C-alpha cells in the first residue's frame, strides 16, 4: 500500500477546503484506508492506497 495525493486525469491534485469528510470519502472510493484534507496544500491526502493508485509524483497539472 502507498500514501499520497490522489490525482485526476490531468495529473492535478484533488482540491479540498479543509473538508476532511470529502477527502475521506474520496480516498475510500479509491480503495484507501482513510484520507484527510491537508491544510497547507488544500489537497486531499490518502493513506493506504493500492500500490497501483494514481498519486502525485512529478509533472505539472495539465488542466
Curated annotation (Swiss-Prot):
Q: In which tissues is it expressed?
A: Expressed by the venom gland.
**What do the Gene Ontology cellular component annotations say?**
extracellular region
Residue span, LCN-type CS-alpha/beta domain = 2-62
Q: Which subcellular locations apply to this protein? A: Secreted
- Which SUPFAM superfamilies does UniProt cross-reference here? Scorpion toxin-like
* Gene Ontology biological-process annotations: defense response
Report which residue ranges the record marks as coiled coil. none
Cysteine disulfide links: 12-61, 16-37, 23-44, 27-46
Q: List keywords of the entry alphabetically.
A: Calcium channel impairing toxin, Disulfide bond, Ion channel impairing toxin, Neurotoxin, Secreted, Toxin, Voltage-gated calcium channel impairing toxin, Voltage-gated sodium channel impairing toxin
Gene Ontology molecular function: any one: calcium channel regulator activity
Q: Which CDD domains match?
A: neurotoxins_LC_scorpion
Q: Which domain of life is it from?
A: Eukaryota
Sum up the protein's function in the record's words. Answer: This neurotoxin acts on sodium and calcium channels. It acts on Nav1.2/SCN2A and Nav1.5/SCN5A sodium channels and slows their inactivation. Also binds to Cav3.1/CACNA1G, Cav3.2/CACNA1H and Cav3.3/CACNA1I T-type calcium channels with high affinity and inhibits the channels by modifying voltage-dependent gating. Also targets neuronal high-threshold calcium channels, including P-type, N-type, and L-type calcium channels (Cav), and others that still are unidentified pharmacologically.
What family does the Swiss-Prot or TrEMBL record give for this protein?
Belongs to the long (4 C-C) scorpion toxin superfamily. Sodium channel inhibitor family. Alpha subfamily.
Query: What further fact does the record state?
Result: Negative results: does not affect Cav1.2/CACNA1C, Cav2.1/CACNA1A, Cav2.2/CACNA1B, and Cav2.3/CACNA1E calcium channels.
Name recorded for this polypeptide:
Kurtoxin
Supply the source organism for this entry: Parabuthus transvaalicus (Transvaal thick-tailed scorpion)
Give the taxonomic lineage as stored in the record: Eukaryota, Metazoa, Ecdysozoa, Arthropoda, Chelicerata
Amino acid at each position: 500500500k502507498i500514501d499520497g495525493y490522489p490525482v485526476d486525469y490531468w495529473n492535478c491534485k484533488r482540491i479540498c477546503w479543509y473538508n476532511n469528510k470529502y477527502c475521506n470519502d474520496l480516498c475510500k472510493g479509491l480503495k484507501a484506508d482513510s484520507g484527510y484534507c491537508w491544510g497547507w496544500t488544500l489537497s486531499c491526502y490518502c493513506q493506504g492506497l493500492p500500490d497501483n493508485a494514481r498519486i502525485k509524483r512529478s509533472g505539472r497539472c495539465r488542466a
